[in-house]
Amino acid sequence: MVTQALADRLEIIEVCTRLHWCVDHRDWDGLDDLLADHVSFPTPAEIEAPGFDPASYLRSRAEVKAAYPGLLAGLLTQHLITGHQVELDGDRAVCRAHSVNVHLPDGGGRDALVAHGNEYRFELERTEKGWRISGRQTWIRWRWGDETHYEVDRRLLQWADQVRPVSSAECNQREG
């Protein structure tokens, strides 16, 4: 017999894994089935800032979807996510996972390959349509390869500019 807790864990793992699948396949519309209406997606640098508060990085799903293509422009990516650890708390959950992220310039050779070892903390909420990601925090634990063609830090700064911190009221106002 499958318990509700087990079904929830499986759905949460699927949602967190599918986020990276959509990113790698540039399936931006697929994010509609994975992200809450408002999400907190701070960059690694923002997470390390003194006084970091994930609630202050609330953005609309539409803003996050619009910012992703610029972050990944000119790159082939593959995110291998594993080791999901799910903590359920009623209609909210946290899922932690590790990943190895491979980045290669579109049309580039093996010498241009860049890899990152990341740790993720997903925050999820149960909705009428199932579990949705309401927040994600990322820590880059290690880097390998020549990042000069990739410029991850510059790209993340541009991402932060495109999905600047806003209040929940501002998100609702823009969508309204």
Language-model region placement:
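Short, low-complexity N-terminal intrinsically disordered segments enriched in polar/charged residues
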Residues: M1-D37
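Aromatic-acidic/polar surface patches that form glycan- and anion
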Residues: D8, I12, D24, Y57, ...
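A solvent-exposed, acidic/Ser-Thr-rich amphipathic alpha-helical stretch
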Residues: W28-V100
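A beta-strand edge to alpha-helix "cap/lid" segment located at domain peripheries
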Residues: A73-G176
